[in-house]
Amino acid sequence: MISMLAGNGSSVTEFVLAGLTDRPELQLPLFYLFLIIYIITVVGNLGLIILIGLNPHLHTPMYYFLFNLSFIDLCYSSVFSPKMLINFVSEKNSISYAGCMTQLFLFLFFVISECYMLTSMAYDRYVAICNPLLYKVTMSPQICSVISFAAYGMGFAGSSAHTGCMLRLTFCNVNVINHYLCDILPLLQLSCTSTYVNEVVVLIVVGINITVPSFTILISYVFILANILNIKSTQGRAKAFSTCSSHIMAISLFFGSAAFMYLKYSSGSMEQGKISSVFYTNVGPMLNPLIYSLRNKDVKVALRKSLIKFREKTDFN
């Protein structure tokens, strides 16, 4: 919908989300596919949150950050997935201007927060493997809280900068977003005013939020690898590697798919960018609980104990 401004211009009051595809025969199959993905994402992340909360032996810095990671994945997939699913079976795929800006803010908030939460987890593994004697002091509950609040603070700062700059733009005439969610680059393509400031902000904010986490994670794992190679026992070396393997997989999935998506966008291939963004926005949050639970002995033991307790309660009743 487009309303007239005072003067010769017009302003968009709602957007239309183009979605993944405009082929009618694919809408229903895609609806069921992404519904299954979303259900697995919600059940997996919510289950991991509950499992960590209910088991005292998982109340450690490592699982504190994993708790926050699952919370972020649950929230940020819920920012756009319900609307995406509705659009598969709805004829009118519209979203209000306010709704679009809200979705943009929340999506960016949780995505940037995840960057720094993954970074916090890398630092936690560095301290645990390289400075085990100082681990309890270095990763005290107070310090863990400060680190997690800093991650959310960076998310808030980044999303506020992007959304604030987006609010200053005027959208007129064309209101079809070539995406299944309100994201920065597809929205910038619709602006009928200069996007120079936005592009500078994107360059600065994205640069910071890629460089700082990537550099910190890289340095952490360089020290971790050097320390592991100095471990003489094969069993100790294998244990150290297994401690980090799940986190390395999660990092590779998140940063790899995000980099691939934005490279496709920057090359001008919007359609390929949309497809690759599915791995970044949908597949990652679904796989993270599976990666951390299937490869983690403590989580599997906690799950087994919780299931036994639940079975005992149901049998008793």
UniProtKB/Swiss-Prot annotation:
Quote the protein name from its UniProt record: Olfactory receptor 8B3
Protein location = Cell membrane
How does the UniProt record describe the way this protein sits in the membrane?
Multi-pass membrane protein
Alphabetical list of Pfam families matching this protein: 7tm_4 (PF13853)
Q: What residues are glycosylation sites in this protein?
A: N8
The organism sits in which domain of life?
Eukaryota
Q: According to its UniProt entry, what is the function of this protein? A: Odorant receptor.
An example Gene Ontology CC term for this record: membrane
Q: Which residues lie on this side of the membrane: Cytoplasmic?
A: 54-59, 119-136, 221-242, 295-317
Organism expressing this protein natively: Mus musculus (Mouse)
GO MF term set: G protein-coupled receptor activity; olfactory receptor activity
**Tell me, what is an example of a GO biological process annotation in this record?**
G protein-coupled receptor signaling pathway
Q: Which segments sit on the Extracellular face?
A: 1-32, 81-97, 158-199, 264-274
List keywords of the entry alphabetically.
Cell membrane, G-protein coupled receptor, Glycoprotein, Membrane, Olfaction, Receptor, Sensory transduction, Transducer, Transmembrane, Transmembrane helix
Q: Which family does it belong to?
A: Belongs to the G-protein coupled receptor 1 family.
